[in-house]
Amino acid sequence: MEDRQTRLFLALILSMGIWMGVNYFFFPNTSTKKNTETKQTQSDKTSENTKQQITSGKTKESNSADPVVQKEKITPFDTKKSFIVTDSYIVEFSSLGGKISKFYMKDFTGPNGELIQVARKNPETVVVDGKSYQAVELSRDKGFDFNFSDSLVEISDSPWNYIQFSLTEDKINHSISFSAVSPDRSYQLKKEFRFYPSENYFKLSISIINFSKEKLSFASQKNVRYLRTFGSLGPYPKDRPLSDRDTANFFRFYYLGGSFQDTLDGSSSVGFWSSVGNFFTGNSGTDESFSIKTDKESGVDFAGTGSRYFIAVADPLDHKPHGIVLDNRPKNESGAVLVYDNILLNPGENYNLDFASYIGIRESEGMAFKNPEFDPSQSKNSPFVGLSSDLNKSFNQGITTPFRNGIIWILKQIYRFTIPNYGWSIIIFAILFKLVFYPLNQKQADSMKKMQELSPQLKTINEKFANDPKMRQQKTMELYKKNNVNPVGGCLPMVIQIPIFIALYTAFSDTIDLWNSPFLWVKDLSEPDVIWTSPAIPYFTQTGIGLNLLALLMVGTQVFQTRMTSVSMDPNQKMLMYVMPVMMLYIFWNMPSGVTLYWTFQNVLSIGQQWITNHLKKTEEKKKAKV
């Protein structure tokens, strides 16, 4: 960092750091911690049984077999439908499978009385009892079944999904109850969904009742049971194929053994290096279609699935499941699947499993209770007593969360009190940021101007000591010291920008308020501003290549700013000067256009500040010359 070349190299390193940082924090390695993996040993009966299921696709017969149903013969003509409408939800229920068949979310009022718009992009019109609602469907039109399975290969399509349940409505208490008896008449399965009009939570109670005169081993280490809670979450594009950027927005998560973990949904959770090791060692004997994570001491605290703007969480209130299943099959939609291995019922006994379930936006105001009577932290009589205190980790963005939340709050206030457009809010925010850090930015501008003034002397040094790098470095530093120039004086503003950049990325990637926000020609500030898309290119891309105008403008301002502040440099330094914009173009090409807009306007402001500094310096020199 002792000359211009080093400063340019630092800028390159910082750009690469941003690139790697974004990949690390927001597209994490899908491998999970080794200490939560189920050990494939003969002493672990659960894992042994799981291995048998994976390799054969079948399970051993148990004392309480799941329903054996000829799926192709099932006809839904007797299926009953029912709806529950709350302040936030429209939920459709079906007696076939005793499940939620569709789950819609509509605009709702936040805990502070603010309107939170959910149905912002391509909403569906849902009619219930003659009243129309605009809402977004979150189950990918496949519903949430909350049904058991004793086979891994059937976890996303349980045999119970083909059983007709009896359906009972309780309009007063906003609840729906389902009941069905196993084909062998040995037990009964009951489910009750209870909603609360003002809240974004609902309660699910599952009951298993032993009808037989003998003990019923519903779940054991030898014959585990899998409960699928929430499948893969929506919404997702229906008018085009999913891109890599789209799939990176879907994830599944769980809190196990005191540690929060998440992996990409619809893809493998097997670590990259494990896959590489298997490739080189030829270890193809282990079927990695599924993996089970367990913790015998504390169990699963909660589990769920998420999309770009929404999450769905199932939190066991009165028990701790043994583990969680991770489906590694490509494009799977299994979602969050819990593992049970210790459910034993005496004759006539009723075994209950209670869950608090949240479906909503990935924001704290979505998870906040409006009525303190329902908040378990404020009321001992809350129906959600036992709710995990770590539930907020399901939408936490890590170390950048405070920056992200602060930026979102500032943008909302600017939106509220100035121009109600988030594009202008970003520009005003960029101006405010520039004003707050004006002393540092001015120091950078002064440093650049001084280095420009030294350009002829630097050129002489470079030419004179072209073959002696050590002496060239020494003379350069002597020149800087003599003229009181700090070659790294302009680095700090760039370093400060990094957390802002990452926070802006997260803000525009998963904040519901900024979803589908237009600005000038930009249709959606949360997406790249594609103004034209090429036709599909065979063997290269099926969706074509988009032309992103704002990213090109950003690079243009970056090049102009660099040339404006450049000093005498050798060919290698010139090459670095042009490599940097290419790197930036690569980084920003698929960024949310809101982030690119912010960076572009920061460049424009920096160009303006540098021009004013240079102009004032020339004016001052002319005055001194006259004197």
Swiss-Prot record:
A biological-process GO annotation: protein insertion into membrane
Membrane topology of the entry: Multi-pass membrane protein
Basic and acidic residues compositional bias, start-end: 58-68
Pfam families per the UniProt record, alphabetical: 60KD_IMP
Keywords: Cell inner membrane, Cell membrane, Chaperone, Membrane, Protein transport, Transmembrane, Transmembrane helix, Transport
Localization, UniProt: Cell inner membrane
Segments of skewed composition (Polar residues): 33-57
Region (Disordered), start-end ranges: 33-68
Assembly notes: Interacts with the Sec translocase complex via SecD. Specifically interacts with transmembrane segments of nascent integral membrane proteins during membrane integration.
Role of this protein: Required for the insertion and/or proper folding and/or complex formation of integral membrane proteins into the membrane. Involved in integration of membrane proteins that insert both dependently and independently of the Sec translocase complex, as well as at least some lipoproteins. Aids folding of multispanning membrane proteins.
NCBIfam families: yidC_oxa1_cterm
Family affiliation: Belongs to the OXA1/ALB3/YidC family. Type 1 subfamily.
Name of the molecule in the record: Membrane protein insertase YidC
